[in-house]
UniProtKB/Swiss-Prot annotation:
Belongs to the aspartate/ornithine carbamoyltransferase superfamily. ATCase family. This is Aspartate carbamoyltransferase catalytic subunit. The lineage of its organism: Bacteria, Pseudomonadati, Campylobacterota, Epsilonproteobacteria, Campylobacterales. It catalyses: carbamoyl phosphate + L-aspartate = N-carbamoyl-L-aspartate + phosphate + H(+). The gene is pyrB. Heterododecamer (2C3:3R2) of six catalytic PyrB chains organized as two trimers (C3), and six regulatory PyrI chains organized as three dimers (R2). Pathway: Pyrimidine metabolism; UMP biosynthesis via de novo pathway; (S)-dihydroorotate from bicarbonate: step 2/3. GO terms for molecular function: amino acid binding; aspartate carbamoyltransferase activity. One of its GO terms (cellular component) is cytosol. NCBIfam families: asp_carb_tr, PRK00856.1. The keyword Cell membrane does not apply. It is an enzyme of class 2 (transferase). It holds the Pfam family OTCace_N. Disulfide bonds: none annotated. L-aspartate binds at residues 86, 169, 222.
Length: 308
């Protein structure tokens, strides 16, 4: 049965069949994106507002391109110049934009749960483009598409997620979805950045070599310094790179056809060395970015059909 909900808030809301339906549709849109015209019309006459209350490069641009390629009017809302600076509440802001006949809100916010809060109070559809430490479902879907394209399957793969797991909404979405799909996930990072990981119900490795060993896919995560409070959680960048960074030498422990992924932005020489990040044999980071447009086209197309 196809995904029929009004919104996309969490990967927990998607069944295995839902995920594959979206990925199959994304593959069709990826073919469209290779054509000279790159245009469809399923969102013609519809309005998509990118309501981003946090900074973003890849996600916001990707959603804007996706909406426009489907024929929608895509509007970028910036909280820095909005009436929220004058004391207007979040819901009043959303209600005012909804009164302009908005069909879909794409929401990014620093507070976990904000996307669901908006979805519960709006008749327009809502896509969670990242809410605090909670989830980032479309990043997860583009990661899954990238893995599927490079491995030819999703089930029974070994995936290592390494870095600041505690603050990573990408890690949360990926773990929930990968468990649903039968992917073997293991986690690793500094102790303060892997606290509460037992809630995921997947193995937590004791060192990076254990995490990398026999992996089909390695997903590296940056240190989210902007979300840290108080004392630093590691002695220095040099120490972090030594014990938690991905190097060419460590790559030798993984499977020969391993692929490396990263949600971006990359901090070179910290969680990943440049020679690894730039190696076309292993690295699929730009492939992820490319797939982001197709996946977000698939999500927007699915939600607008659900509204019909």
């Amino acid at each position: 049965m196809p995904y029929t909900k009004k919104d996309l808030i969490s990967m927990k809301d998607l069944s295995k069949d839902d995920i594959f339906d979206i990925l199959r549709l994304a593959l069709k849109f990826k073919e469209l994106n290779k054509s000279p015209v790159k245009k469809a019309d399923s969102l013609r006459g519809k309005t998509v507002i990118n309501a981003f209350f946090e900074n973003s490069t890849r996600t916001r641009t990707s959603f804007e391109i996706a909406a426009k390629r489907l024929g929608a009017d895509a509007i970028n809302f910036s909280s820095s110049v909005s009436s929220t600076k004058k004391g207007e509440s979040l819901i009043d802001t959303i209600k005012n934009m909804e009164a302009m006949k908005t069909d879909i809100f794409v929401v990014r916010h620093a507070s976990s749960g904000t996307a669901k809060f908006i979805a519960d109070n709006a008749s327009a559809s809502v896509v969670n483009a990242g809410d605090g430490l909670n989830e980032h479902p479309t990043q997860c879907l583009l990661d899954l598409l990238t893995i599927y394209e490079n491995k030819g399957r999703l089930e029974n793969l070994n995936v290592a997620i390494i870095g600041d797991i505690f603050r990573s909404r990408v890690a949360r979405s990926n773990v929930w979805a990968m468990k649903t799909l039968g992917i073997n996930v293991k986690l690793f990072g500094p102790p303060m950045m892997t606290r509460d990981c037992e809630a995921f119900g997947v193995p937590l490795c004791s060192n990076i070599d254990e995490a990398v060993e026999n992996s089909d896919v390695i997903i590296m995560l940056r240190i989210q310094l902007e979300r840290q409070d108080g004392e630093p959680e590691f002695p220095s960048v040099r120490e972090y790179s030594k014990f938690f960074g991905l190097t060419a030498k460590r790559m030798e422990l993984a499977k020969k056809d391993v692929i490396i992924m990263h949600p971006g932005p990359i901090n070179r020489g910290v969680e990943i060395n440049s020679d690894v990040a730039d190696d076309p044999k292993f690295t699929k980071i730009l492939n992820q970015v490319e797939n982001g447009v197709a996946v977000r086209m698939a999500v927007l197309d699915t939600l607008i059909k659900n509204r019909s």
